[in-house]
């Protein structure tokens, strides 16, 4: 029995499912999860000592690679002065100033510890600001595991939303309306029907939890126009795509200014950190200034802030995002070319440092499109690549991530492995 198997069996005795986040359990693809022993640059080593090229990067935060020397040094510098204070620090101001500089739509920002906290708090703030209850989200977009966001569409546009998780009360879910991503007509119909009830629309401008699906400019511009017209708050959830699609996030890429933005992953540099921010007149409704309550013991944790600040400074290097996008595009195009040469139905997309792999002929534009992917073939591909030391997301519904540490050698090795994997899929 491998060390990975031994650890997984041990974990399952004391941790539900053996993992602390469901996708890590390999339930979608089968097999034994890899338990990470250490990581460096574009690689990690599992409990059996095998090395993998890592295209998850902790699900997005490791944009400069694992254990970057500048990030490590920043963390080491602050450790001797204390791990957590529950009181303000100058470093909190510095990271807030950095975020506001890089994302101009954010006039004020509040630090939290997770993406779920960021989206949950932003929605509460939007409700407090507008005095309304209804929120609109989109099928396939994931915004964390708060009750009001674990909701699926009802049987028709105007029906109440239905919970997607046990433990979510129907009375909570009914305040959430779920629409199809990139469907402008459905959006217009919803605002015509109950626009005056909508507190906020929350959207991933580049979705990463139904694999990679880009918002179309038409769709995102319609969101901006309709929310402004009806007095609703437009929230961009850039926890995943923030600082990855462009230095200023997806909102810079598309040229669209939201009212509030949720950030995470990259801003913690691999440490637990997230944030939400936006217009000053909205943010002023937060306690202690206003009546919308939000708090957190570890918010603005000095160790997390140090890692985040170091990462944000590294990604401002001239040409950083152009180089990252070029690498990611080379990977996506190379995989598509290898599949095409093998005669395997497949498509791929990339934007910034994010990419998507789909076992379908066309790049998806909605969750319904993603579900047409050949899941069985994806699972086989995943294991073929894993066996050769390439670690993609263990789910057909997750995006992948490239870092600045991925060099030509790692990309070449990945494409060589893919050539053999696609040939095996065809056989």
Curated annotation (Swiss-Prot):
Query: What does the record give as EC number?
Result: 5.4.3.8
InterPro entries per UniProt: 4pyrrol_synth_GluAld_NH2Trfase (IPR004639), Aminotrans_3 (IPR005814), Aminotrans_3_PPA_site (IPR049704), PyrdxlP-dep_Trfase (IPR015424), PyrdxlP-dep_Trfase_major (IPR015421), PyrdxlP-dep_Trfase_small (IPR015422)
The prosthetic group or cofactor this protein requires is: pyridoxal 5'-phosphate
Q: Name one GO biological process term.
A: protoporphyrinogen IX biosynthetic process
Tell whether Isomerase is among the UniProt keywords: yes
Positions modified as N6-(pyridoxal phosphate)lysine? 265
Question: Where does the record place it?
Answer: Cytoplasm
Q: What does the record give as the reaction this protein catalyses?
A: (S)-4-amino-5-oxopentanoate = 5-aminolevulinate
Q: In which pathway does it act?
A: Porphyrin-containing compound metabolism; protoporphyrin-IX biosynthesis; 5-aminolevulinate from L-glutamyl-tRNA(Glu): step 2/2
Q: Which Gene3D superfamilies match?
A: Aspartate Aminotransferase, domain 1, Type I PLP-dependent aspartate aminotransferase-like (Major domain)
Q: Which GO terms describe its cellular component?
A: cytoplasm
Query: Any idea which GO molecular function terms this record carries?
Result: glutamate-1-semialdehyde 2,1-aminomutase activity; pyridoxal phosphate binding; transaminase activity
The answer, when asked if Translocase is one of the entry's keywords, is: no
* Alphabetized UniProt keyword annotations: Cytoplasm, Isomerase, Porphyrin biosynthesis, Pyridoxal phosphate
* Principal location class: cytoplasm
Q: Which HAMAP family match?
A: HemL_aminotrans_3 (MF_00375)
Q: Which family does it belong to?
A: Belongs to the class-III pyridoxal-phosphate-dependent aminotransferase family. HemL subfamily.
Question: Which NCBIfam families does its entry note?
Answer: hemL (TIGR00713), PRK00062.1 (NF000818)
Name used for this protein in its record: Glutamate-1-semialdehyde 2,1-aminomutase
What organism does the record attribute this protein to? Answer: Burkholderia pseudomallei (strain 1106a)
């Amino acid at each position: 029995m491998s060390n990975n198997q031994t650890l997984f069996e041990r974990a399952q005795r004391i941790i539900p499912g053996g993992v602390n986040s469901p996708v890590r359990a390999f339930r979608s693809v089968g097999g034994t999860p890899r338990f990470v022993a250490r990581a460096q640059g574009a690689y990690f080593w599992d409990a059996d000592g095998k090395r993998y090229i890592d295209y998850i990067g902790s699900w997005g935060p490791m944009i400069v690679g694992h254990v970057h020397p500048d990030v490590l040094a920043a963390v080491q510098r602050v450790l001797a002065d204390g791990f957590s204070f529950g009181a303000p620090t100058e470093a909190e101001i510095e990271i807030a100033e950095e975020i506001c500089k890089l994302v101009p739509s954010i006039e004020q920002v509040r630090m939290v510890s997770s993406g779920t906290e960021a989206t949950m708090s932003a929605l509460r703030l939007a409700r407090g600001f507008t005095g309304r209850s209804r929120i609109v989200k989109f099928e396939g977009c994931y915004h964390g595991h708060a009750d009001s966001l674990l909701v699926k569409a009802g049987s028709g546009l105007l029906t109440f939303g239905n919970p997607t998780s046990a433990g979510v009360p129907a009375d909570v879910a009914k305040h959430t309306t779920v629409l199809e991503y990139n469907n402008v007509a459905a959006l217009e119909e919803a605002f015509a029907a109950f626009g005056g009830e909508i507190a906020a629309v929350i959207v991933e401008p580049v979705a990463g939890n139904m694999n990679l699906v880009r918002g179309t400019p038409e769709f995102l511009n319609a969101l901006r126009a309709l929310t402004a017209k009806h007095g609703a708050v437009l929230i961009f959830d850039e926890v995943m795509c923030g600082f990855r699609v462009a230095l200023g996030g997806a909102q810079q890429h598309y040229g669209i200014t939201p009212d509030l933005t949720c950030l995470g992953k990259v801003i913690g540099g691999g440490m637990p950190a997230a944030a939400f921010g936006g217009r000053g007149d909205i943010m002023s409704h937060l306690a202690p200034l206003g009546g919308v309550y939000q708090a957190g013991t570890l918010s603005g944790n000095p160790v997390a802030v140090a890692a985040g600040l170091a990462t944000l400074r590294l990604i401002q290097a001239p040409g950083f995002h152009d180089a990252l996008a070029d690498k990611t595009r080379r990977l996506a195009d190379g995989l598509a070319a290898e599949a095409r040469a093998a005669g395997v139905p497949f498509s791929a997309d990339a934007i910034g440092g994010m990419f998507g792999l789909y076992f379908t002929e066309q790049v998806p534009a909605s969750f319904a499109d993603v579900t047409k992917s050949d899941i069985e073939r994806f699972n086989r591909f995943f294991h073929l690549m894993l066996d050769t030391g390439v670690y993609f997301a263990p789910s057909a519904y997750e995006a992948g991530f490239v870092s600045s540490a991925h060099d030509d050698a790692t990309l070449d090795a990945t494409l060589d492995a893919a050539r053999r994997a696609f040939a095996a899929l065809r056989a």
